[in-house]
């Protein structure tokens, strides 16, 4: 085990997720999740050696309070002195950053500049970053951008068909997300299949509460479904994905809704939750659909159909298909969704292997198509934290 450990932080507006990793082995020594930040009942849950315990944060219910509680927990286990650097997930680096970078004042200013591109996420990342700088004094901080991997997209893939001055003036274009996951999974897929990633044309579906899909060729992103923000593309847990932009004027005129209300509705009340009227959790949707609930059945079919359609279009972007890859919480665990998606893809020569599909769950990688399929469909568990740890160690010189 290497002497120095990496702390990885992923901050949301009301949450903070953390993990302490051994960069060499990938082992997670301690993890935490702070929830309800900025509310009086804020708390943080720690997991160490398989045991969990909860700490009240009501005295300081913000990101600094959460990072402070994390420092105390590390001290209690004698791990505080072994932290060598801190890695941070940042949703948007816009066009400023095409790779991970060591933090200085200029980088913080750059992340601030990208706030309009990720107004829900980047401010929270900055709170976590500043908290880490104040509590873990003197340690190097590294930021890893969700958008960086997609900076290889060609101009015709990232440009929107609107007046070009809007791009030049405001940076209005497709940026994508989940890039750290795609970078990890494209490497792992090649390793798992025993191929060079530069020889593989991949379509990778990262399916969780937020869901996106990316075409990868020559080891690089060629196109992706998320756009200016993570709202575009697939049907998601609470996000609508693709929708006619005229919805804004239609709802403003007919439902008397403001832009802020419509944006909030499309981000937080739509997707599986909005269609089903039940839940944003795919497991609940699958269970209720099996019982015949009409809303759940429709939500599931829409999720699957939209995904299958996008696989077809991303195959064009990749220049063909050698490997279709499922990852993320839903992609790694829902054999039902994978089977039904592949049911649409017989025209691509992809045929499900039922037994293999059932085995490839709960952290198990595996090929889930038959030997006579023209390409492979494969399940590869993602590990964004490990990718962030690797970048952090490398850029910190550990």
Locate the predicted segments by residue:
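Short glycine-rich, Thr/Ser-proximal phosphate-binding strand/loop in the N-terminal lobe
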Residues: 15-60, 227
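Extreme N-terminal starter segment of soluble prokaryotic enzymes
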Residues: 2-7
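Internal helix-turn-beta structural module
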Residues: 297, 301-322, 331-398
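Short beta-strand-loop/turn "lid" adjacent to the catalytic site in phosphate-handling enzymes
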Residues: 74-121, 140-142, 148-157
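Glycine-rich phosphate-binding loop of actin/hexokinase-like ATP-binding domains
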Residues: 151-253
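Catalytic phosphate/nucleotide-handling subdomain of diverse soluble enzymes
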Residues: 217, 223-255, 264, 328-360, ...
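Glycine-rich beta-strand-to-loop/alpha-helix junction loops that act as flexible
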Residues: 11-12, 89-92, 207, 321, ...
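Adenine-nucleotide phosphate-binding core of ATP-dependent small-molecule kinases
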Residues: 264, 271-275, 282-317
């Amino acid at each position: 085990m290497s002497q120095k450990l990496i702390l990885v932080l992923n901050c949301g507006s009301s949450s903070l997720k953390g993990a302490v990793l051994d960069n060499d082995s990938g082992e997670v020594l301690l993890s935490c999740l702070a929830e309800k930040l900025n509310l009086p009942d804020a708390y943080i849950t720690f997991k160490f050696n398989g045991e969990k315990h909860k700490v009240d944060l009501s005295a300081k219910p913000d990101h600094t309070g959460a990072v402070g509680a994390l420092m105390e927990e590390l001290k209690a286990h004698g791990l505080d002195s072994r932290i060598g650097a801190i890695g941070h997930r940042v949703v948007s680096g816009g066009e400023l950053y095409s790779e991970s970078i060591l933090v200085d004042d200029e980088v913080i200013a750059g992340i601030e500049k990208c706030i309009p591109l990720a107004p829900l996420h980047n401010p929270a990342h900055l709170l976590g970053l500043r908290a880490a700088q104040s509590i873990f004094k003197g340690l190097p901080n590294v930021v890893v951008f969700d958008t960086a991997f997609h900076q290889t997209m060609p101009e015709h893939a990232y440009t929107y068909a609107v007046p070009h001055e809007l791009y030049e003036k405001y940076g209005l274009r497709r940026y994508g997300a989940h890039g750290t996951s795609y970078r990890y999974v494209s490497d792992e897929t090649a390793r798992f299949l025993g191929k060079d990633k530069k020889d593989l044309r991949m379509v990778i579906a990262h399916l969780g509460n937020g869901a996106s899909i990316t075409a990868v060729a020559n080891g690089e992103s060629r196109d992706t479904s998320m756009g200016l923000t993570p709202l575009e593309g697939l049907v998601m847990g609470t996000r609508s994905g693709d929708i006619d932009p005229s919805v804004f004027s239609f709802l403003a005129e007919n439902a008397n809704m403001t832009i802020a209300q419509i944006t909030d509705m499309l981000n937080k009340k739509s997707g599986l939750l909005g269609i089903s009227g039940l839940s944003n959790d795919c497991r609940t949707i699958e269970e209720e659909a099996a019982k015949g609930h009409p809303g759940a059945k429709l939500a599931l079919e829409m999720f699957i159909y939209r995904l299958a359609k996008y696989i077809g279009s991303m195959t064009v972007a990749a220049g063909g298909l050698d490997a279709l890859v499922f990852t993320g919480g839903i992609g790694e665990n829902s054999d039902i969704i994978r089977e039904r998606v592949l049911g649409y893809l017989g025209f691509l020569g992809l045929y499900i292997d039922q037994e293999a599909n059932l085995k490839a769950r709960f952290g198990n990688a595996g090929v889930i198509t038959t030997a006579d399929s023209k390409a492979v469909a494969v399940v590869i568990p993602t590990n964004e934290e490990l990718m962030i740890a690797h970048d952090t160690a490398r850029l910190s010189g550990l």
